[in-house]
Amino acid sequence: MEIELHRNSILPAVMERVGQRRGGILVFSRLDSKRTAHIVVDLQDGFMAPGAVAEIAEARVIVPTVNRISQAVRDAGGLVVYIQNTVDDVAIRTWSTFFDHFCSPARRQMMIEAFPPGSEGHAIWPGLEVLPRDLKVQKRRFGAFAPDAPDLHDILRARDIDTLIITGTASRVCCEFTAPDAMMLN
């Protein structure tokens, strides 16, 4: 059964150019499973529940695939980390440019109410198979490696993780902000 996970595609000309630059399409031909983490970004009630303030209905479709990836990573000895979008006093104070200029006052208030720690919107989506050994890390900006959050980089380094599989609610927002930062941090 084929499942359409998202509507993104890469033009064949871009794939060819990248392949020529790298000497092949794949960045890694093999993964060391014990040094690999599955980073699950923003699969939370505030993004996924029907009628939620920041609902992205399409994200519900990827849950079975995310669960399969998480289980495969665990079975191979890797780590699963759930990243939670967090709006709290620190986020509002340290990312005022976003909250004051990119959000209307009404939208800002909705986000403040939807994503504080412990709120319904902050909770991991119940369809995800979260195990006690999995980690949960809060983020206060689009990227999981951005400032003013627990240092995901240090958490991963302490566990000798150097390879990430990133899945999440919005490929073109928080996943895309997380991936290049991870690469830049090696």
PLM region descriptions:
Residues 84-86, 140, 169:
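Short, well-ordered beta-to-alpha junction loops that form the rim of enzyme active sites
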Residues 76-78, 160, 186:
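Glycine-centered short loops/turns at secondary-structure junctions
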Residues 117-167:
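Internal catalytic-core helix/loop-beta-alpha segment
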Residues 175-185:
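Short Gly/Thr/Asp-enriched flexible loops that form oxyanion-binding sites at enzyme active sites
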Residues 170-174:
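Gly/Ser/Thr-rich loops at beta-strand to alpha-helix junctions
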Residues 1-135:
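Active-site acidic carboxylates
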